[in-house]
Amino acid sequence: MSRFDNVAVTKQANVYFDGKCVSHTVEFADGTKKSVGVILPSTLTFNTGAPEVMETVAGACRVKLAGENEWKSYAAGQSFEVPANSSFEIEVAAEPYHYVCHFG
């Protein structure tokens, strides 16, 4: 799916890591929320409250989940899961990484 229909979008962006990650919150009619964003080339660490599924829309990244030793690579069309109350490192190298973060 390349678009979301019948949603509310928060106008003001969520800006993290001095602008290296920028996203917008999208709320669906059933109350569920997702964020749609871009990470510029960098290596960042994110903490999670709720479980997350990170869907790769464009670009590529490498990810290391908390407690793991190895990095795993993801490209457009792939996703990875992060448990609640955890963290992950993400490395974006060549071009911006476009994603949808599915919460819960």
Curated annotation (Swiss-Prot):
<comment type="function">
    <text>Catalyzes the phosphorolysis of diverse nucleosides, yielding D-ribose 1-phosphate and the respective free bases. Can use uridine, adenosine, guanosine, cytidine, thymidine, inosine and xanthosine as substrates. Also catalyzes the reverse reactions.</text>
</comment>
<keyword id="KW-0328">Glycosyltransferase</keyword>
<protein>
    <recommendedName>
        <fullName>Pyrimidine/purine nucleoside phosphorylase</fullName>
        <ecNumber>2.4.2.1</ecNumber>
        <ecNumber>2.4.2.2</ecNumber>
    </recommendedName>
</protein>
<dbReference type="Pfam" id="PF06865">
    <property type="entry name" value="Ppnp"/>
</dbReference>
<dbReference type="GO" id="GO:0047975">
    <property type="term" value="F:guanosine phosphorylase activity"/>
</dbReference>
<comment type="similarity">
    <text>Belongs to the nucleoside phosphorylase PpnP family.</text>
</comment>
<dbReference type="GO" id="GO:0009032">
    <property type="term" value="F:thymidine phosphorylase activity"/>
</dbReference>
<dbReference type="InterPro" id="IPR009664">
    <property type="entry name" value="Ppnp"/>
</dbReference>
<dbReference type="InterPro" id="IPR014710">
    <property type="entry name" value="RmlC-like_jellyroll"/>
</dbReference>
<dbReference type="GO" id="GO:0004731">
    <property type="term" value="F:purine-nucleoside phosphorylase activity"/>
</dbReference>
<dbReference type="GO" id="GO:0004850">
    <property type="term" value="F:uridine phosphorylase activity"/>
</dbReference>
<dbReference type="InterPro" id="IPR011051">
    <property type="entry name" value="RmlC_Cupin_sf"/>
</dbReference>
<dbReference type="GO" id="GO:0005829">
    <property type="term" value="C:cytosol"/>
</dbReference>
<keyword id="KW-0808">Transferase</keyword>
